[in-house]
Amino acid sequence: MAKDFGVQEITDDLQPSFNVAPTDNVAVVLNNGVKQLVAMRWGLVPFWATDPKLASKHINARAETLTLKPAFKDAFKRRRCLVVADGFFEWQKQGATKIPLFIHLEPERPFGFAGLYEIWTPPLGEKLVTCTIITTEPNELVRPIHDRMPVILPKDAEDFWLDSAVEDHMRLLDLLQPYQASDMSAFTVSKLVNSVKNNSPECIQPVSAMGQPPLF
């Protein structure tokens, strides 16, 4: 993973996770003069917050309102990051049933969601470093499944996004587009992912590999 993003320092012990839930730790790349791979809690707590429970409301940030929302506008200017993943889950309605899908790049490889991070310092205790994932309109693959999708940054845009010296906010906003659908794919996975208690490689295996019929 470090090689995929040109990381120079790994500051935390990062363990694989196959079913990430809000408030879990996620792997994040940032650039503070040195490109680092760190762990952050998913769910952004604004620096001005009085209660860290706000994190549950801020797991995602809409690209269209980043410069307007108090929770995100300062982080957008100064604290941009990549949230590392190799796919994400969405649930497709089929009658009264919701079918879990794992959506990934084709061929499968790690990528970075466009993210923001914050450092929250309570009156007492240790600082809390949290992040959010930016969403945008869905592409042709995701549109039948959900009305939003996370922003996946192309490789050639990652360094520009991470550069805190960049002040051209319009160019930054222009990066927050749906990823090319032809370079993505999806497959049905087990309903194990419906419970955050389940966090094993089986969560991201195609159901056909587990002896179940595929959806498509």
Model-based region annotation:
Residues M1-F216:
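Short linear sequence motif anchored by a di-proline
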